[in-house]
């Protein structure tokens, strides 16, 4: 095998660069361990979502805002792969591109960062809470209808700065981003799924590459976490059937459980002695309005996560969830 430099596209935010560098570090270790002659370099790309910061996500085009320019660079051969936050990836990828690998998922929860150190239920009546998504707004208002939800855009560091400078009582951010940046000490409280169900794929990364790049796909397969890939596939199919983007409050979280309802050992991975058939996927899904939400839960065999996500979405729609 000849030596090759793999060009990795990424947004230029501090979080995007940090998680891309972490992935490259892991891939370098895997390449050394398997004797693969690959090097990696980073190419920064500005996306539409990075350029437009004064408008809410729901008003500027929905899903794909943070990936379209990167995907085009991949199709044009300017880059070979890209590291995305999975929650930013559209449920349907452009022809010629695939999700080549899904590393082990980090914390999927949302995190509350409060100026006063108060938890969500302790915030004063009419507290100003900053968030960037309709998904969070819908669920927070279902939990605390008195809250004043206001949009806050920008990178993690700029949102944290706005918390101090713009008079918010609190802001909501994805826990995984704060943890990847080493900023867990800023978190006041983590929000449970019954209060704020996470975005599809939240906490997971997607490594996108060209479908015809067999050499790179072989490398990425070494980095893929099968259990994360299964659960994220179910969530993404749920989203695709609902045809949702940033304009609709949609959330979903899937995890693996043993047939008796117990979660797998080892941080979400199946123990080596477990038979795959003993595991089931459990998915909780939500589609809501600006001030309400509806839930449906179910479970199925782990072998068919895509069909499962589709079935759960169909059942939720039949029970009254409507995406308009």
UniProtKB/Swiss-Prot annotation:
Misc. remarks from the entry: The porphobilinogen subunits are added to the dipyrromethane group.
Cofactor binding, note field: Binds 1 dipyrromethane group covalently.
Assigned keywords, A-Z: Porphyrin biosynthesis, Transferase
Pathway: Porphyrin-containing compound metabolism; protoporphyrin-IX biosynthesis; coproporphyrinogen-III from 5-aminolevulinate: step 2/4
Catalytic activity: 4 porphobilinogen + H2O = hydroxymethylbilane + 4 NH4(+)
Gene name of the record: hemC
Protein name: Porphobilinogen deaminase
Family, per entry: Belongs to the HMBS family.
Organism: Paenibacillus macerans (Bacillus macerans)
InterPro entries: HemC, Porphobilin_deaminase_cofac_BS, Porphobilin_deaminase_N, Porphobilinogen_deaminase_C, Porphobilinogen_deaminase_C_sf
Obligatory cofactor(s): dipyrromethane
Enzyme class at the top of the EC tree: transferase
PROSITE patterns, sorted: PORPHOBILINOGEN_DEAM
